[in-house]
UniProtKB/Swiss-Prot annotation:
It is found in: Cytoplasm. GO terms for biological process: arginyl-tRNA aminoacylation. This is Arginine--tRNA ligase. It holds the Pfam family DALR_1. It catalyses: tRNA(Arg) + L-arginine + ATP = L-arginyl-tRNA(Arg) + AMP + diphosphate. It comes from Burkholderia cenocepacia (strain HI2424).
Amino acid sequence: MLPAHKQTLEALLADSVKQVAHALKGADAAFVAPAITLERPKVAAHGDVACNVAMQLAKPLGTNPRQLAEQIVAALTAQPAAQGLVEAAEIAGPGFINLRLSAAAKQAVIAAVFEQGRAFGTSDREKGKQVLLEFVSANPTGPLHVGHGRQAALGDVLANVIASQGYAVHREFYYNDAGVQIGNLAISTQARARGLKPGDAGWPEAAYNGEYIADIARDYLNGETVAASDGEPVKGTGDVEDLDAIRKFAVTYLRREQDMDLQAFGVKFDQYYLESSLYSEGRVEKTVDALVKAGMTYEQDGALWLRTTDEGDDKDRVMRKSDGTYTYFVPDVAYHVTKWERGFTKVINIQGSDHHGTIARVRAGLQGLHIGIPKGYPDYVLHKMVTVMRDGQEVKISKRAGSYVTVRDLIEWSGGAAAGQEAAPDLIDEATITRGRDAVRFFLISRKADTEFVFDIDLALKQNDENPVYYVQYAHARICSVLNELKSRYNVDVAQLPGADLSQLTSAQAASLMQKLAEYPDMLTHAANELAPHAVAFYLRDLAGEFHSFYNAERVLVDDEAPRNARAALLAATRQVLENGLAVLGVSAPAKM
């Protein structure tokens, strides 16, 4: 039901409960009513709304739950405000209260969608608050892999979901550009620049084997200039002995490549934060010094340890090794201090499940600083692995990366790119990229983050209802076609439909579709509160299913004006909600397919 109706019904039920409690216990008796919880029954025949408050209160009030439910229903239906909202009420099982909404209450969603348009489903309840989402945060040592793709989809969609509730959302990418892996990138590029390739004598053991390294070396030797979206241009010097110059060029080259991958995926960031800046600005040392002064550390075996067990970790952790280098979670603590200092009191990190062990360490470090950061800061969404299948076989390598499937591979394959074009993005037309982007974004968000996901390229290419993104997009396109035909055959424009007589919508299929439309705002709120962006994909599939059921049951383009326009109005509202939901996912809503 619509949020306004839900709030009204919750208030009416709460008042009814209060009346019954006073009648049973006396007006002066101490009584704390539980929060009213409304749910949609799993079986449509049981009504539109179910409430279990009678079973919660039966024992405290010393009465039978079914009798209590009957008294609550009597008090509810006696209230004038309920009579235009509730059509019928019945008691089920041990004391469930099942309510049927009035036809007018169900139909109200159509007017709400027409009135609010693209804003339908959104809320300003969190207006004035801000949240930082950090996601992808890949090392600039190679192309983005499918795990980064899942992070990008989760992060970007979750950002849209949270923004729908009024938050100002800041998207941030943390570049791990300081560490051993960057050194390995430099020596890999240097080896390629010297004419070596994997398997040759002299090829570094820790080197990266992907063909992209050869591309970097070639451009470095040719004196090409590269630049990331937020950085200064770097020119290749061609000097194979200057490892620092090679490192700078290779990092910038790969940052540019990752920018291109993200652009193809429809993901934009507000800020890129460099790990190296934490060292150059002295933030890592400052954080370590503060933890030492706070008594949160001790020295043992030549290493500096953090008392993470004080904050619930299973053992204390090394911060600074005996060789003077820091372990990887130390700059993470310093980085999160910057988030707090920048005013982000709500922070969400989206990372692979292999980062689970760092959560307690980072939080312990932040608590040990005693600077007002609350426990549980930051929040985390951890995702599991993605397996790619093509032609019934698991795909483990690609020409582009050498040892893993890249995001760009996935987009191009899912868009139908011909074999052999994977390493030549300039050969891929925009329509292929759009199809691929839509499929990959929808697929990667269509499961809970904490479940492993099998990405089936063959399924992504299917143009039938087995393919979830096609199924949802086709529903939108089908409605567009019907509304175009409405205009050409009957000269009725969508702008005229808000005046339709909605009392014509009497079928069970119409009622079910209207109820599903009305659930959209609450679904978005739930997805934001629970950090569950997959809920949007689940909802859209269900909505498309309700549309198809309605459309298959009732002819829309009939000569009788009243039922025709009412049904067309329902379709127009459905089209708008499909478009709104697809926009949250960053997926296109085609008018033709």
